[in-house]
From Swiss-Prot:
Propeptide regions on this chain: 23-50
Entry keyword annotation includes Cell membrane: no
Signal peptide extent: 1-22
Family listed: Belongs to the conotoxin T superfamily.
Cellular localization per UniProt: Secreted
Organism encoding this protein: Conus pulicarius (Flea-bitten cone)
Lineage, highest ranks first: Eukaryota, Metazoa, Spiralia, Lophotrochozoa, Mollusca
Name of the protein in question: Conotoxin Pu5.4
Modification after translation: Contains 2 disulfide bonds that can be either 'C1-C3, C2-C4' or 'C1-C4, C2-C3', since these disulfide connectivities have been observed for conotoxins with cysteine framework V (for examples, see AC P0DQQ7 and AC P81755).
Amino acid sequence: MRCVPVFVILLLLIASTPSVDATQKTKDDMSLASFHDNAKRFLQTLRNTRSCCPEEITCCPWG
C-alpha cells in the first residue's frame, strides 16, 4: 500500500515532462552532429596539409 502513492507521483511526473523539444529552432542553430562532422573534416584537411606542405607549397589548399 505504501508503493501506490509513489507510483502515482512518478506517473504524474513522467506525464508532465515534454517528450519533444519545445523551443523553435532558428537558422543559427547547428546540430551537434554537424559540428562534429565539420571538426573531423577540418582535422583531416590539417593532417593532409601537414604531410605534403613542407615539401611542396602548391599542394596546400590555401596556396
